[in-house]
Amino acid sequence: MKKIGIVGSGLVGSLQAILMAKKGYDVSVFENRPDLRKAKLLAGKSINLALSDRGLKALREAGIEEDIKAMSIPMYKRCMHAVDGTLSYQQYGKEDQAIYSVPRGGLNQKLMNLADKYPSIKYNFNRKCKDVELNTNTLIFENLETKEEEKHAFDSIFATDGAFSAVRFRMQKTPMFDYSQKYLDHGYKELVIPANEDGTHKLDKNCLHIWPRGEFMMIALANMDGSFTCTLFFPMFGEKSFDTINTKEKVSAFFNETFADTIPLMPTLLDDYMENPTSSLVMVRCSPWNYEDKILLLGDSAHATVPFYGQGMNCGFEDCTIFGEMLDAANGNWDGLLSAYSKERVPDGNAIIDLSLRNYVEMRDLTGNKEWLLRKKIESKFNDLHPDKWLPLYSQVTFSHIRYNKVVQNGVEQDAIMEQVMKLPNIEEKWDSQEVMDKMLSLV
């Protein structure tokens, strides 16, 4: 039986372990940290994730789609909070289409518990990856409990150890390996809207709440316990930034001016802001994602992105399903498979980073913009009439399995068409008229 080593027991690593075990492989998973199922889950690293169709497909293949949906909250639309407290809504897709707010820790635990049911999967915690012997495909770990060095050789290795992957660091020293990382000027901080005393939510739980403010924004996603996890995306430095808004007095003044409608909802705001960590946002691009037929990067180790399309986990899960499909198509023959996968998938990894950056501008600058909202209404109406001719960009990313790279190309074409449509005289009054729909039909 082929022996598989997986470095990293996070979401992608645990899912890949399950999918490989289902295909009959012997899998060993190594994790730097202790078993998170025995640790208290701490805030800091986003505890809500937006699960959408690409990720759901992978969970379906693992056999736990319904289990995960049962611990998540469907979000059917965005709710935009203006500075004056006015609310406006935008449907994500068709009436029944939703993205799901799912707790990172709970999802990770569920995947690990499912993996434990496979006798062919073994978890090894407190193992820090120090190096990889490429010629023998041997992983070298420090056992953090005994302080001893351990060596484990495998037929194939999957690196799912995140944006600062130790395995990728070794691959970076090989010839012709391209690598870049870039930090966003903005970071993020987690805050909380607690549940009402009776355990109900203070805001509509079936919306993703956004406070768009131009240079920055805050979002809130519902938790099963009635609370919301809020994330403030804010410049790291500058006049209004994490660097300068650094006392309780300044935080109070800033929120009263900028997010006034949240003040009554957030009784622990000042303590949360001062005590919770400020985290940075990093993007990683690299190529190739494989080393010979031995090692393959999956998830953030290959393509760490920023969270503004809610696609980090979904893209990582899609990595696993696409690899599985290619392995099946090759009838289990690994010769040249990792290289073929890398060539196929790298353009999509780059594309989701580009799409995520674009969506950040859209979320913080445009969701409050009347012209942008009108454009979205026109697109939605045309999509209702001609679903075979037009799928809005957001739906292509979130509710389809179209390759991310193709989505980028489609987006460029759609932008060019909508630019012409938005220039039509009196478009604000006649946006849903037959004339406008016919014009779009002539352009697609």
Protein language model regions, located:
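Conserved N-terminal helical subregion
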Residues: 2, 21, 52-192, 442-443
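C-terminal helical "tail/cap" subdomain of flavin- and related membrane-associated enzymes
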Residues: 325-444
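Conserved FAD-binding catalytic core of PHBH/FMO-like flavoproteins
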Residues: 113, 118, 127-131, 136-281, ...
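Conserved Rossmann-like nucleotide-cofactor binding loop
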Residues: 12, 35, 164
